[in-house]
């Protein structure tokens, strides 16, 4: 049966579509920049591509599914569950990509001489594959049984088979709040965020120690190296900060829902928290453009070559740029 869309839902859909229209092209641009620019081919940028792929999927898949769920169509229980799980997969993928980036930056400043022999392209690819495998396992856990099926069945005719079980599809109807808080947040979101915080604190401490060493004629190169590392570390720490700022409010609301069932959370706060989580997928390309010179150079090359119909003869020399 067709369901009318309220004015509030129309506003929600409009904002979600706007986020998707910024997120998808922006992150495709990030992937494109890494593909065309040799200076963006090290391990860090491979992990950034993995993060960008997850963000593209948020705009192209999760946001449309979120709009459908917000309308609340009548669907079979597991069909609704399948629409709710992708956001869990992609959130975990983003967290693990950010963790891989943090570990990579730590190794760059901790063992700069041996870094390239330790962090090889093959090992980076294996790490990315492992991140995605873990993300699917964590995000699909509700499909394996940790969901609200038994709770919903308790309110219905027990003689009805699961395949005939039709519900109004909403995220909180099918996803267990115990799963969201105890497993998703307390195990797979909060600990990695705290670990990344400690890693970046150590990265900044190592860089500060190196930069505070007495500069001599023989130490110009190390000073320059660590100065560049400091700039990129600050930019990637900003990406982490924005991710935490975007996702923690929704997880805090989930904790309130679980631990204080009688507490009434205003719907507007829930929607703002959802907008923050989805909007985070559009933030990273903006950070890269303004904070990382390699990306800024690559973005300008793409713009000049493909959108301004200019043949930038100097692009080949810029491509070989190795500024870190």
From Swiss-Prot:
Top-level taxon in the UniProt lineage: Eukaryota
Residues bearing carbohydrate: 159
InterPro entries associated with the record: Adeno_A1_rcpt, Adenosn_rcpt, GPCR_Rhodpsn, GPCR_Rhodpsn_7TM
TM helices/strands, residue ranges: 11-33, 47-69, 81-102, 124-146, 177-201, 236-259, 268-292
Lipid attachment site numbers (S-palmitoyl cysteine): 309
Keyword Lipoprotein part of the UniProt annotation: yes
Cytoplasmic side: 34-46, 103-123, 202-235, 293-324
Compartments (UniProt record): Cell membrane
Entry GO CC: dendrite; plasma membrane; synapse
Keywords: Cell membrane, Disulfide bond, G-protein coupled receptor, Glycoprotein, Lipoprotein, Membrane, Palmitate, Receptor, Transducer, Transmembrane, Transmembrane helix
Signal peptide: none
Gene Ontology molecular function, alphabetical: G protein-coupled adenosine receptor activity
Ranges of the Extracellular topological domain: 1-10, 70-80, 147-176, 260-267
Keyword Transmembrane helix attached: yes
Membrane topology note: Multi-pass membrane protein
Annotated S-S bridges: 80-169
One record GO biological process: G protein-coupled receptor signaling pathway
PANTHER family: ADENOSINE RECEPTOR A1, OLFACTORY RECEPTOR AND ADENOSINE RECEPTOR
Job of this protein: Receptor for adenosine. The activity of this receptor is mediated by G proteins which inhibit adenylyl cyclase.
Family statement: Belongs to the G-protein coupled receptor 1 family.
Name of protein: Adenosine receptor A1
Species assigned in the record: Gallus gallus
């Amino acid at each position: 049966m067709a369901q009318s869309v309220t004015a509030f839902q129309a506003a929600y859909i409009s904002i979600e579509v706007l986020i998707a229209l910024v997120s998808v092209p922006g992150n495709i641009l990030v992937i494109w920049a890494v593909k065309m620019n040799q200076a963006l081919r090290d391990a860090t940028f491979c992990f950034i591509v993995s993060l960008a792929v997850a963000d593209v999927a948020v705009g192209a898949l999760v946001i449309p599914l979120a709009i459908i769920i917000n309308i609340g169509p009548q669907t079979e229980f597991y069909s609704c569950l399948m629409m709710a799980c992708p956001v869990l997969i992609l959130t975990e993928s983003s967290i693990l990509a950010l963790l891989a980036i943090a570990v990579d930056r730590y190794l760059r400043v901790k063992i700069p001489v041996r870094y390239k022999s330790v962090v090889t392209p093959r090992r980076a690819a294996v790490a990315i594959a492992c991140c995605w495998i873990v993300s699917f396992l964590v995000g699909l856990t509700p499909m394996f049984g940790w969901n609200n099926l038994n709770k919903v069945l308790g309110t219905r005719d027990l003689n009805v088979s699961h395949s005939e079980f039709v519900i109004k599809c909403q995220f909180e109807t099918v996803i267990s709040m115990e799963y969201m808080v105890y497993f998703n947040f307390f195990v797979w979101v909060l600990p990695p965020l705290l670990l990344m915080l400690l890693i970046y604190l150590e990265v900044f401490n190592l860089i500060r120690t190196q930069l505070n060493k007495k500069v001599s004629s023989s130490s110009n190169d190390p000073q320059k190296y660590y100065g560049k590392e400091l700039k990129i570390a600050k930019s990637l720490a900003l990406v982490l900060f924005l991710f935490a700022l975007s996702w923690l409010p929704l997880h805090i609301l989930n904790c309130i829902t679980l631990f204080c069932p009688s507490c009434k959370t205003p719907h507007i706060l829930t929607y703002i928290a959802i907008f923050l989580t989805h909007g985070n997928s559009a933030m990273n390309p903006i950070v890269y453009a303004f904070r990382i010179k390699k990306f800024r150079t690559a973005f300008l090359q793409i713009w000049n070559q493909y959108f301004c119909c200019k043949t930038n003869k100097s692009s080949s020399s810029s491509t070989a740029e190795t500024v870190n």
